[in-house]
Amino acid sequence: MAKSSFKQEHDLEKRRAEAARIREKYPDRIPVIVEKAEKSDIPTIDKKKYLVPADLTVGQFVYVIRKRIKLSAEKAIFIFVDNVLPPAGALMSSVYEEKKDDDGFLYVTYSGENTFGFGSP
């Protein structure tokens, strides 16, 4: 998978400092970077940085992403952390502890496909 554009735009020290500041100020929240998969035809999300409640499940977070990109009901959405599809029932805090980047952010990539096999007219 290509290097995150967030990582390309901000150097490691700046990202580390920002993640540490966020975790200190909001200890019950997870700093998450959300980016669309390169070859996906799903809409692009309007913002990349999210502060997610630690007790939110992956499934609930997927719902948040779906709302932000205004995804129609017949479209599926899949999120990947480190190229792996996390379980929908997993807490974001446990995914964060297992998969957070060296800079302190959790990087989530989303992608979609049409689950019913037909496109827009």
From Swiss-Prot:
Expression sites (tissue/organ)? Constitutively expressed.
Name the residues where the record annotates lipidation as Phosphatidylethanolamine amidated glycine.
Answer: G117
The cellular component terms of Gene Ontology attached to this UniProt record, alphabetical and capped at eight, are: autophagosome; autophagosome membrane; cytoplasmic vesicle; microtubule
Topology relative to the lipid bilayer, per the entry, is: Lipid-anchor
List the InterPro entries. Atg8-like (IPR004241), Ubiquitin-like_domsf (IPR029071)
Give the source's domain of life in one word: Eukaryota
Pfam family, any one = ATG8
* Keywords assigned by UniProt, alphabetized: Autophagy, Cytoplasm, Cytoplasmic vesicle, Cytoskeleton, Lipoprotein, Membrane, Microtubule, Protein transport, Transport, Ubl conjugation pathway, Vacuole
Annotated localization: Cytoplasmic vesicle, Autophagosome membrane; Vacuole membrane; Cytoplasm, Cytoskeleton
State its role: Ubiquitin-like modifier involved in autophagosomes formation. May mediate the delivery of the autophagosomes to the vacuole via the microtubule cytoskeleton.
Name the UniProt record assigns to this protein: Autophagy-related protein 8f
- From what organism does this protein derive? Arabidopsis thaliana (Mouse-ear cress)
Q: What is the lineage of its organism?
A: Eukaryota, Viridiplantae, Streptophyta, Embryophyta, Tracheophyta
Gene (name only) = ATG8F
